[in-house]
Curated annotation (Swiss-Prot):
Cited InterPro entries: DEAD/DEAH_box_helicase_dom, Helicase_ATP-bd, Helicase_C-like, P-loop_NTPase, RNA-helicase_DEAD-box_CS, SPB4-like_CTE
Notes concerning its domains: The Q motif is unique to and characteristic of the DEAD box family of RNA helicases and controls ATP binding and hydrolysis.
Annotated protein name in UniProt: DEAD-box ATP-dependent RNA helicase 18
Start and end residues of each stretch annotated as Disordered: 506-561
Originating species: Arabidopsis thaliana (Mouse-ear cress)
Comp. bias regions, Basic and acidic residues: 506-524
Protein keywords: ATP-binding, Helicase, Hydrolase, Nucleotide-binding, RNA-binding
Locus of motif Q motif: 16-44
Family that this chain belongs to: Belongs to the DEAD box helicase family. DDX55/SPB4 subfamily.
SMART domains: DEXDc, DUF4217, HELICc
Motif (DEAD box): 174-177
Catalyses which reaction(s): ATP + H2O = ADP + phosphate + H(+)
CDD domains for the chain: DEADc_DDX55, SF2_C_DEAD
Length: 593
């Protein structure tokens, strides 16, 4: 079946050329060149409203084509503006989104349409690069459409008085719920305060929280609410009409022990080697570790494994994202940095190796596939004691179908451990990933399901392929189960070397420095002991060598000892064991009289 025809049929039969008020010829041509003929439901509902100068609050499923739903009307509104064409530093449109990646994506989508406007320049403003570089571009080239993250946008607006917002036509707040969740309310409020009230505003959000409602009240004027829901056949039969999962998405869960998870993941990657997957982990350290160790498994050598997370430098994230976007197959290993907003084409499978801390992120993760009417699959790995999550998600109108563990999955733990014994980088990253996961698990929003005290760290450590269990205060204090872990025998872990010769050289130098420091401390300790021994024979000399605080501490201890002795003697007097004159002699009280 022709995929494009299937997409169009699954979404809507409304063409962009059929919309009212009609779109300009330049926009229709730009849409056709990008193979956009038919609208998605959110596009068909939203574009006419914004083009009719209405404020909109849009609540749509993830993967619904929201970007074009505001980019197209933004360009149309600018074209029809009385201020068109604008002066070089006259800002007519602002688009705010929560992450650098999403802002970059919006900018790239918008470029073909903005370029249809003569003398209009759009500028991308995100963190990760020098703010002075952005200021120089704006000063020299001008800017009429600002697209970026709240932090960098507000920073530029505060610094550059040259920017003129008096004739601004339209403001777009994309992923508004995420903007608030990430703590950008102050910056968003500042940006809105700098803009004229006589403008069009579009607020796009996957969830309608109280914060989003408040933002809508403050930033929108009599908005039209647009709600677009995707509904699958299985959901219809269960009357789950409010589900936000895309209609072509097949959701599954796999229940397996912690020491079997890594083997099941490798088996899944092998069986889908010709597909494009996203694998979600809970922490940045986990992404780093699995990105390194999975590449050591011979059966995965032919599969492109690309890690990306929020702690990576911006240019590294951009490079990784571009590489995966261009690839026809492979796996993107990531944290929730890629769970929302990133519209990576052609994702076939989403794997949630670790369930998200925030259950609201589940759909955003799974929604990276089955976008724009395509078919897709998503699976979440669960431990046996986490099975209640299935019922929890069903109540939230996200039904999960069970998938059994693969019986022919090869045990990869020996391979992982072998890699750790050959390269200290693997061993150390594994320990760091394990510790970060255990601590992150404690912060689960659904702690009644993901019970930290029930975490079997022995099996978990085996699943990570650790050589030994790290010393953790959390483990010692709460006695988490270490059953199921088999430590590696006959290996001196301190002697495992880095494969990277430079890192190993640095390690050896650091070891030598620490060794010399310990020897020096040992010498100093010996000197102190000799001094203390000498001082003990000469109390006055010892007293002179002590600081005031040390003398006070010693005096307090001596006083407490005397008080304790006197109290015990007093008890003996009361019991008639000794006479009062004996008490006075022993305590020295008779010296006072």
């Amino acid at each position: 079946m022709d995929s494009s025809a299937n997409i169009n049929k699954a979404l809507t039969e409304t063409r962009f050329s059929d919309l009212e008020p009609p779109l300009s010829g330049d926009i229709i041509e730009a849409l056709n060149q990008s193979d956009f003929e038919f609208c998605t439901p959110v596009q068909a509902a939203t574009i006419p409203l914004l083009c009719s100068y209405k404020d909109v609050a849009v609540d749509a499923a993830t993967g619904s084509g929201k970007t074009l739903a505001f980019v197209v009307p933004l360009v149309e509104i600018l074209r029809r503006s009385t201020s068109f064409p604008p002066k070089p530093h006259q800002v007519m449109g602002v688009i705010i989104s929560p992450t650098r990646e999403l802002s970059t994506q919006i900018y790239n989508v918008a470029q073909p349409f903005v370029s249809t406007l003569a003398n209009v320049n759009s500028v991308l403003l995100v963190g990760g690069r020098e703010v002075k570089a952005d200021m120089k571009i704006i000063e020299e080239e001008g800017c009429n459409v600002l697209i970026g993250t709240p932090g960098r946008l507000s920073d530029i607006m505060e610094r550059m008085e040259i920017l003129d917002f008096r004739n601004l036509e339209i403001l777009i707040l994309d992923e508004a719920d995420r903007l608030l969740e990430m703590g950008f309310q102050r910056q968003v409020n500042y940006i809105i305060s700098r803009l004229p009230k006589q403008r069009r505003t579009g607020l796009f959000s996957a969830t309608q929280t109280e914060g989003v409602e408040e933002l809508a009240k403050a930033g929108l004027r009599n908005p039209v609410r647009v709600e677009v829901r995707a509904k699958s056949k299985s959901e219809s039969s269960q009357q789950l009409t409010n589900s936000k999962t895309p209609s072509g998405l097949h959701l599954e869960y796999m229940e397996c022990e912690a020491d079997k998870k890594s083997s099941q993941l490798v088996d899944l990657l092998i069986k889908n080697s010709d597909k494009k997957l996203i694998v979600f982990f809970m922490t940045c350290a986990s992404v780093d570790y699995w990105g390194l160790v999975l590449s050591k498994i011979p059966a995965l050598k032919s599969i492109s494994l690309i890690p990306i997370h929020g702690d990576m430098k911006q240019n590294a994230r951009d490079k990784a994202l571009a590489s995966f976007t261009k690839a026809s197959s492979g796996a993107l290993l990531c944290t929730d940095v890629a769970a929302r907003g990133l519209d990576i084409p052609g994702i076939d499978y989403v794997v949630q190796y670790d369930p998200p801390q925030d259950p609201n992120m589940f759909n955003h993760r799974a929604g990276r596939t089955a976008r724009l009417g395509r078919q897709g699959r998503a699976i979440v790995f669960l431990l046996p004691k986490e099975e209640a999550y299935v019922e929890f998600m069903r109540i939230r109108r996200v039904p999960l179908e069970e998938r059994k563990c693969s019986e022919d999955a090869s045990d990869v733990i020996p391979i992982i451990r072998s890699a750790a014994m050959k390269d200290r980088a693997v061993m150390e990253k594994g320990l760091k990933a394990f510790v970060s996961f255990v601590r992150a698990y404690k912060e689960h929003h659904c702690s009644f399901i993901f019970r930290w005290k029930d975490l079997e760290i022995g099996k978990l450590a085996m699943g990570y392929g650790l050589l030994y269990l790290p010393s953790m205060s959390e483990v010692k204090q709460h006695r988490l189960s270490s059953e199921g872990f088999t430590p590696v025998e006959g290996v001196k872990f301190e002697e495992i070397k880095f494969k990277d010769k430079y890192r190993e050289k640095q390690r050896q130098q650091n070891l030598q420095v620490r060794k010399e420091k310990r020897q020096e401390e040992k010498k100093e300790k010996g000197k102190r002991k000799r001094v203390d021994a000498s001082a003990s024979n000469d109390p006055k000399k010892a007293s002179r060598k002590l600081t005031g605080k040390q003398r006070q501490t010693i005096q307090t201890a001596e006083d407490e000892e005397v008080m304790d002795r006197d109290y015990k003697l007093m008890i003996k007097v009361k019991k008639g064991l000794i006479k009062e004159d004996e008490y006075e002699r022993l305590t020295g009280d008779d010296d006072l009289f």
